[in-house]
């Protein structure tokens, strides 16, 4: 090896080795101080790229876990509002059950409806004002997507539904609306109600006054109706003619010769107190008669005594005593019971509803006048109409009864089957709450899975980029020793050219 001064090869070699050990020491210290095996791409280019992708996934999944927790919060907020809506619906149902009880007065029903209305308004308020981070969760149908993954499309959808009075089918819910008017309602709710019911018995038609019960014919100029005293048939005659008894038919002395002769023959030889019958009439002999049949006989009709004198039979011109007959009443046979009476007519009684029914009369429609307006009621009296429209009884704000037609009543008509309507609303709320409960459980599961994934990805990334302290400490110790040795050797190498100077002495 040549002895040169210009180039110290040993020094250069030592410097190079010293630089390497310095670089190794620097790398070890950097890794130990940062905790990372890869502090820059030069440390491990491929590993750095892989670790960076892991970092993206880890950060994305961590945020996704927070998103899922937000989803739980949204579901809890919505479900809490629905719980309050459910409480209001339960109270409305309770009030509706109370309202259907027949013991409630009009004021009771009004109070019940007032509270129901307040409850329904509260349901709408909860629907309109419940929100999460500025998003209203019950005021409209909405699908809210929650990002629960680190990549596109990894979402869970929360179905938010509009829940208010209208969507629940309770818009216009009413337990105290106007009810269909009946004839009974008109009589009880209004003053000075007049009118009549119509009946038909065969071809004959009648009217019955709804207040007095008087029966008249159904005509422009109605006639009063009576019940025939003899046969119970309906008639417009107020009396029936009784049958005159021939024996007492006349008061003239020239008449009744045949009757006188017949009576004379019956009492001939009779004694006082004897009785005999003639034409269904029982007579008593008042004076003893001889063989000529002359004498007096009497009978009692309607409590009044009637006396007949038979005289001048032997002369062949037997006559009823004129004076006696003129002071007595004509006698008739009643068409009702066949008894003798002084009345030439039997009075018929005014017909009543029961008489119409006895004659198999069939009830028809009714005409009812209220406050000057005439309404028509059907045969059963449970439907009242005006101009073809069904009438309802409503209450004014001051509680006064009033009649309105079906058009006006439609907007505030009582809800048909109110309990079924509320049950349907409760079922819808329950369905939405169940969905929200299920989605909360799903988010819980997603959060657990995300946590597991993040843990595993962190472990995988750690194995790639984290520093192994045992290895790095060993590397640092090795580099430190090499640094110390290199520095010492470099000093020796730098002394080698000094040996060449000895040749110049």
From Swiss-Prot:
InterPro entries, alphabetically?
A: Flagellin, Flagellin_C, Flagellin_C_sub2, Flagellin_N
What is the source species?
Salmonella derby
Keywords attached to this entry: Bacterial flagellum, Secreted
- What this protein is called in its record is Flagellin
Its annotated function is as follows:
Flagellin is the subunit protein which polymerizes to form the filaments of bacterial flagella.
Kindly indicate whether the keyword Secreted belongs to this entry. yes
The source's domain of life comes to Bacteria
Entry annotated with the keyword Secreted? yes
Q: What is the lineage of its organism?
A: Bacteria, Pseudomonadati, Pseudomonadota, Gammaproteobacteria, Enterobacterales
